[in-house]
A protein has these predicted regions:
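Conserved post-catalytic alpha-helical subdomain immediately downstream of the catalytic base
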Residues: 108-109, 133-190
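Conserved N-terminal subdomain of the carbohydrate kinase-like
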Residues: 1-28, 182-191
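Conserved phosphate/ATP/ADP-binding segment of small-molecule kinases
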Residues: 32-127
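Solvent-exposed alpha-helix faces
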Residues: 20, 99, 169-173
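Extended, hydrophobic alpha-helical segments in both membrane/secreted and soluble proteins
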Residues: 30, 45, 54-58, 64-67, ...
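Short alpha-helical functional segments enriched in proximate histidine and acidic residues
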Residues: 22, 104, 174-175
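A short, flexible beta-alpha/helix-coil linker loop
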Residues: 3-6, 80-82, 135-136
Length: 191
């Protein structure tokens, strides 16, 4: 069990001012929800980031994604998405459920990470599936963090999301081929 105390409401409110100031000096926002209470103001954070036209990427947690309403993209894995939309029995069922969720939450995109099946980007024009990079898997620790981090960096440069997903997928494939949590070098990614 996890016995950490929730952050005090006053503490979180105090940090919102700092958050607002930082928005103008950054090109993307990544919010990783660990279900610890640190993102109790996530709706406000998303709205403020939207107002300054930042791409907002969310690594979701739990079974209520309504708090991520208006984000640019959320990046659940299969188990996380199942908690919210239920089990799908076919690819067509998955597409319908993912697109319905994306539309209900007014997300630009939903990026489903699918382990050995790669990832699928659900967007207004349909979906794009990017196959996993063919390599041996040694450790999946940090793969999701790598994917969202690289995706954010590419979107921050103005790269179209369809291209950014390809690079993020490549980065995820590189880190699972290493032991422990690992970084991806520029040479590994683009060399």
């Amino acid at each position: 069990c996890d016995f950490e105390a929730m952050p005090a409401e006053e503490t979180l409110k105090r940090h919102l001012g700092t958050f607002s100031k930082l928005l103008t000096t950054n090109q993307a926002l990544v919010l990783s929800d660990y279900g610890k209470g640190g993102l109790s103001h996530i709706s406000t954070m998303i709205a403020e980031a939207r107002a300054v036209k930042l791409p907002i990427l969310v690594d979701p947690k739990g079974d209520d994604y309504s708090r991520y309403h208006g984000a640019t993209v959320i990046t659940p894995n299969r188990a996380e998405l199942r908690q919210v939309v239920g089990t799908w029995t076919s690819e067509a069922s998955l597409i319908e459920r993912a697109q319905n969720l994306r539309q209900a939450l007014e997300l630009d995109y939903l990026l489903l990470t699918r382990s050995e099946e790669g990832m699928t980007l659900f967007g207004p024009q349909g979906q794009l599936t990017v196959p996993a990079q063919a390599r041996e898997v040694y450790d999946v620790s940090g793969a999701g963090d790598t994917v969202i981090g690289i995706l954010a960096a590419m979107l921050a440069t103005g790269m179209p999301i369809e291209e950014a997903v390809q690079i993020a997928n490549r980065a995820g494939g590189i880190v699972v081929g290493k032991l422990g949590t690992a970084a991806v070098s520029y040479e590994e990614l683009f060399g």
